[in-house]
Amino acid sequence: MQQILEHIVGIANDLLWSKLLIVLLLSFGIYFTFRLKFLQVRMLKEMVRVLREGAASRSKNSISPFQAFCISMAARVGTGNITGIAIAIALGGPGAIFWMWIIAIIGSASSFVESTLAQIYKVKDVNGFRGGPAYYMEKGLNKRWMGALFAVLITLSFGIVFNSVQSNTVSLAFENAFGTNRLTLGLILIAVFGTIIFGGVKRIAKLAESIVVVLAVLYIGVAFFVIFSNITQLPGVLALIVKNAFGFDQAAGGALGAALMQGVRRGIFSNEAGMGSAPNAAATATTSHPVKQGLIQAFGVLTDTLVICTSTAFIILFSDAYHTPGLSGIALTQASLSSHVGSWASGFLAILILLFGFCALIGNYYYGETNIGFLNKSKKLIFVYRIGVLAMIVFGCVAKVQLVWDLADLFMGLMVIVNLIAIFLLSKVVFTALKDYTRQKKAGKDPVFYKDVLKNHNGIECWPVSDTKTDTHNKQIS
């Protein structure tokens, strides 16, 4: 039965990832990049400023922009940054890293669009703000069926399949480092995680905020130590990445097509640009203008890939471990780091993976809960979902690595297709919001959003109409 499932999933992934999704992600990302006038470069300083502003704003009764950023980063900065990169290099060669950089740079524009839309079309309930692709598909496009389809896909993807990926990597890391029984670890994971997911969204936000920053800094610190210790190899490694990306150097076994496909796959799994996941976290923030959260989430994509994923890539490529046949995933990263700093690194990385993976479990779970709320407000359904999440965490701990990752790729691809269509159709709303933000910044103001700046503001619930009714036509930005 498992072999049949592996075969079906493999065929579906080949159809999705060989051409279709690569073309869609690159073409939409390039389109948004040009329409936003290379926002990811020209507004990089503003991204940092807005993030710092969000970190300074605190409220007991709402989720701050920085907390929303941390929820999304908790999902992004998971095992994909460590295990996914190793798989990309093993299957696609060093050139896969180059294509990950490209997809992150142009994908950050897609992330800006989807997260800004999530803020514009967010809704409010007793627990605070909620939103995401399902909500802007219903309220912006007036297509509830499309929102429902996406809600089902993201709930299955993140809450169910992606959480099994995280637990799978954690269990393998502990098995490699300490010989820990994988089922036992799975039971421990669900015991701890179960106490958290019954605690509500705000508890999730606070936990994510407290863990994710420390983990990222710790891992980057170790990576920088490795980089500076091997600084003389850096030019050669960079040259290897570029040559392999275009098929000029096949020594590592990665042809152009393999490098491109693996780079895009693992890049999207790690930074989630255009996938429609981060907008669910972006919508929860209390902010004065939707563009602010769009900028913060775009910065998250760049940070995740260009800093954290690249750190893993250098750890691997500075060693000879990636030449070892059959070595992939977390085992490759553990072997590579151990070659740099000693055998203790395997255990250190296992513990780090546990914490990284746990953060990702938190973010992934929240995405599913938000979209179940879109489908049905039933508390019983949420309870069933929580039990399903816990069951899949145990399944991931004992399942085969390849099947788990292949399932993740399949559901991720379906999500991307639905979301990209929606954000393309709604992109003019974002372009208008950005013009409004830029206009207010040039006037020396802290931008504040009013929904009547848009010609059509049907479906927008949480943003007020401007106080000044005079000359409304002139305030609208075409």
From Swiss-Prot:
InterPro entries tied to this protein: Na/Ala_symport
Gene Ontology cellular component terms for the protein in this record: plasma membrane
Compartment list: Cell membrane
UniProt keyword terms in alphabetical order: Amino-acid transport, Cell membrane, Ion transport, Membrane, Sodium, Sodium transport, Symport, Transmembrane, Transmembrane helix, Transport
Record-level Gene Ontology MF annotations: amino acid:sodium symporter activity
UniProt topology in membrane: Multi-pass membrane protein
Chain ranges passing through the membrane: 14-34, 85-105, 145-165, 185-205, 211-231, 236-256, 298-318, 342-362, 381-401, 411-431
Biological role: Probably functions as a sodium/glutamine symporter for glutamine uptake.
Similarity comment: Belongs to the alanine or glycine:cation symporter (AGCS) (TC 2.A.25) family.
Protein name stated in the entry: Probable sodium/glutamine symporter GlnT
Organism listed in the record: Bacillus subtilis (strain 168)
